[in-house]
A protein has these predicted regions:
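Conserved P-loop NTPase motor module
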Residues: 525-564
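Conserved P-loop NTPase motor cores
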Residues: 391-512
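Basic- and hydrophobic-enriched, low-structure N-terminal and domain-boundary segments
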Residues: 1-157, 171, 421-423, 487
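Helical/strand "switch-coupling" subdomains that flank nucleotide/phosphate-binding cores, especially
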Residues: 211-358
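Conserved ABC ATPase signature
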Residues: 146-152, 161, 380-412
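Glycine-rich phosphate-binding loop of nucleotide-binding enzymes
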Residues: 127-217, 478, 500, 504, ...
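Hydrophobic positions in the central parallel beta-sheet of the AAA+
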Residues: 185, 379-381, 427
Length: 564
C-alpha cells in the first residue's frame, strides 16, 4: 500500500489517498508511517471511504496542480476518484526520540504501511504479541513500582473466552522476568491461577515454571488463619453463637461474647506464664495463640461460671434461665460446636500438628522482601468457592477484606517511615465483580467494595498496584475503571453501557477497529486469534491512544520473543 497525504490536516489526524493498493489487502487498523522532513510520523488507519471527485475542493485541486508533473498526480487528475484514508496520528520520532505532534504534516507526503518497529529494544521491554494486522512485535514497558516510584492500576475486561486469564498470566510472567524483586498477591476465585502455579491442567503458560517453584499457595481456611480479637468477636456475632443458649438481645449477646474473649485472653496469659515464666502484656496476646485445649477449657468452665451469667443478664430471673440452658447437654453441645467452628478459622496449629500462617504473616513476607532487597514474594490465595467452607461468600469476603486491610496498613507504614521505599506489590483481583460490584445487596460486600475503591484511590504512592479482571466494566464500580491507568480490552463489549464507556474513553473511532476483533471460538475463523486493545503508560507507540495487538498464539512464540 502506498498513498499521499491529502485533504484535512490536523494535529491529531490527517487524510490520505491511496495511490497503490493490492485488492483485498486489509487497511482498517493498520499502522502507517509518514516521512515529514527529518521526522517519522506513525499513525493508524481508523476509517476509509471512496471519493468520486478528489478535486472538487479548490484547495485540494491547487495542491495537486503544483505536483501535476508527478506520475501519481497525473493518474489521480485523470481518474479524479480514489480511496481516502482517515489516519489517527499516534506519535512522531526523530532519531529515536519522541517529538510532540505540534507541526503540520506536508500535503502530498508519502504514506506507507509500517513494516518494522522504529525503536530498539530496551530494558524492561516485553512482548505479549504483534500489532494487529502486522508481524511487528508490540513492545510494552514493564517496570516495577519501586523503579517507577509509584504503582500502576490495571483493568482487564472481555467476555468469557476472550483470553483475558491467559493474557494476565503472560503479563505476570513478564513482570517477574523483568522485575525479580516485585511482589504479587493473587486472589484466585475460580482456580485457574492456582492450577497454573501448580502445573495442573493444559494451560498456555505454567507460572510454576516462570517462578521456578518459588511461590506460596494458600487455601483458606485449610492453611491460612484469620487474626484479631475484633474480627473474632465479629464472627461470633454474625454466626449468632449465643442463640444456642436462648440469648437474643444484642446487648446481652455482646456481653456474653466479650466475656468469652476476656477468658480466652486470660487463659492464654496463664499458659504463657507457666511455659516461659514471663508476664506477657495483653496487647501481645493474639488469636494466633488460641489452641483447641484452651478453647475446650474456657467453654467447659462457662457451665458453672457465675460471672458469665451475670455478664449476660442483670436480672436474676433471666440468669436462672441461662444457668438451666448451660446445663442442658444438647443445647450446650451446639453452643460449644458453634464457638469451635469459629475458632477453627483462627487457630494456627492443625490437628496433624502442622501449622498455618496468619494473614499478617503473609503480608509481612512482602515487607521483608522489600526491606532486604531480596527476590519478591508471590502469594496465591485459592478462594474457589467449593473450598471456603460454611458461609461461602461471606467467609471469602472476610479473608479478602482482612488481607487487603493488612496490606494497606503495612504500605502506609512503610511509606511514612521511608519515602525512598514502597511495597512494590501488585494485587490481582480475579473475577473482580465479586469483590467490587456495581450493584450490591449485602453489607459485607458493600464494606469490602468501598474499601477496595479507597485503596485504588490512595495506594499508588505506597507502591501497591491493583489489577481488576472482569467480564464487563459495567459489572464493577466505575471508580475502579477510572482509577486504572492501564487498560486491556478484549472482545465482547460492542453493545450497551460497555460500548458507550469505550466510546467515551477512547473516542468513537475506537469501535470501528475494536468491532473487527475476531472471536477465537468462531468455527469459521481459520485463525484462533486473541486480540486486545491496550492503553496506558506501559505502551510505547503512543501514551494517549490504545495499541491493538494480536496475542502470541503459541507458548514457543511468547518465550522466543521474551526469553531468547
Amino acid at each position: 500500500m502506498r498513498g499521499i497525504v491529502y485533504g484535512d490536516i490536523a494535529p491529531s489526524h490527517v487524510q490520505a489517498v491511496l495511490t497503490e493498493y493490492q485488492e483485498g489487502e486489509a487497511i482498517l487498523g493498520r499502522l502507517v508511517q509518514i516521512k515529514n522532513g527529518d521526522k517519522l510520523v506513525i499513525g493508524r488507519v481508523v476509517n476509509f471511504y471512496r471519493r468520486s471527485d478528489l478535486l472538487k475542493d479548490y484547495d485540494q485541486a491547487k495542491h495537486f496542480d503544483r505536483r501535476k508533473d508527478s506520475e501519481t498526480t497525473q493518474e489521480l487528475l485523470n481518474l479524479r476518484e480514489g480511496i481516502v484514508l482517515e489516519i489517527e496520528l499516534l506519535t512522531a520520532l526523530r532519531g529515536g526520540v519522541r517529538e510532540p505532534l505540534n507541526f503540520p504534516i506536508k500535503h502530498l507526503s508519502e504514506v506507507e504501511f509500517l513494516e518494522e518497529f522504529p525503536l530498539e529494544r530496551t530494558a524492561y521491554m516485553g512482548y505479549l504479541g504483534h500489532f494487529w494486522g502486522t508481524n511487528i512485535k508490540a513492545p510494552l514497558i514493564l517496570q516495577d513500582f519501586q523503579t517507577l516510584k509509584e504503582a500502576y492500576h490495571f483493568f482487564v475486561a472481555g467476555q468469557t473466552g476472550s483470553g483475558k486469564s491467559t493474557l494476565v498470566q503472560m503479563l505476570l510472567a513478564l513482570y517477574n522476568r523483568l522485575n525479580p524483586r516485585m511482589n504479587f498477591l493473587i486472589l484466585d476465585t475460580v482456580g485457574e491461577f492456582t492450577a497454573s502455579f501448580k502445573g495442573e491442567r493444559e494451560l498456555f503458560v505454567y507460572l510454576k515454571d516462570v517462578w521456578q517453584g518459588q511461590m506460596e499457595i494458600y487455601t483458606p481456611p485449610e492453611d491460612l488463619a484469620l487474626e484479631g480479637w475484633e474480627l473474632f468477636t465479629e464472627l461470633c456475632l454474625e454466626n449468632k453463637i449465643m442463640k444456642h443458649l436462648d440469648v437474643k438481645s444484642v446487648d446481652n449477646v455482646k456481653g456474653g461474647i466479650d466475656y468469652i474473649v476476656e477468658k480466652l485472653i486470660e487463659r492464654i496469659k496463664q499458659k504463657k506464664k507457666q511455659q516461659f515464666s514471663l508476664f506477657q502484656p495483653t496487647e501481645d496476646i493474639t488469636t494466633k495463640d488460641i489452641t483447641d485445649e484452651i478453647v475446650k477449657e474456657v467453654i467447659n468452665d462457662l457451665k458453672n461460671d457465675r460471672n458469665f451469667v451475670e455478664r449476660v443478664y442483670k436480672m436474676k430471673e433471666y440468669q436462672e434461665g441461662l444457668r438451666y440452658t448451660l446445663n442442658n447437654p444438647v443445647r450446650f453441645k451446639k453452643f460449644a460446636e458453634a464457638i469451635q467452628g469459629i475458632v477453627g478459622q483462627f487457630t494456627v496449629v492443625k490437628p496433624d500438628g502442622t501449622t498455618k500462617k496468619t494473614i499478617r504473616d503473609v503480608v509481612d513476607g512482602f515487607l521483608k522482601s522489600v526491606l532486604k532487597g531480596s527476590s519478591g514474594k508471590c502469594v496465591v490465595l485459592n478462594l474457589t468457592l467449593y473450598k471456603t467452607g460454611g458461609n461461602l461468600v461471606g467467609m471469602r469476603s472476610k479473608y479478602v477484606r482482612e488481607i487487603l486491610r493488612w496490606l494497606y496498613e503495612v504500605g502506609v507504614d512503610l511509606y511514612c517511615k521511608n519515602e525512598d521505599l514502597n511495597l512494590n506489590t501488585l494485587v490481582v483481583l480475579e473475577e473482580a465483580h465479586n469483590y467490587v460490584p456495581k450493584w450490591v445487596d449485602d453489607d459485607e460486600t458493600t464494606t469490602l467494595a468501598n474499601e477496595i475503591v479507597k485503596y485504588f484511590m490512595e495506594t499508588r504512592k505506597f507502591g501497591i498496584g491493583w489489577m481488576c479482571i472482569t467480564t464487563r466494566p459495567s459489572n464493577v464500580r466505575r471508580e475502579v475503571f477510572d482509577q486504572s491507568r492501564v487498560r486491556f480490552i478484549g472482545i465482547g463489549l460492542t453493545s450497551g453501557p460497555d460500548a458507550e464507556l469505550l466510546k467515551e474513553v477512547f473516542g468513537p473511532e475506537f469501535l470501528n477497529i475494536y468491532r473487527l476483533f475476531p472471536d477465537p471460538s468462531d468455527p469459521l475463523s481459520p485463525k484462533k486469534e486473541v486480540c486486545f486493545a491496550i492503553s496506558g503508560p506501559i505502551t510505547v507507540l503512543s501514551r494517549q491512544n490504545p495499541d491493538f495487538i494480536t496475542v502470541f498464539s503459541s507458548k514457543e512464540g511468547f518465550i522466543k520473543a521474551n526469553w531468547e
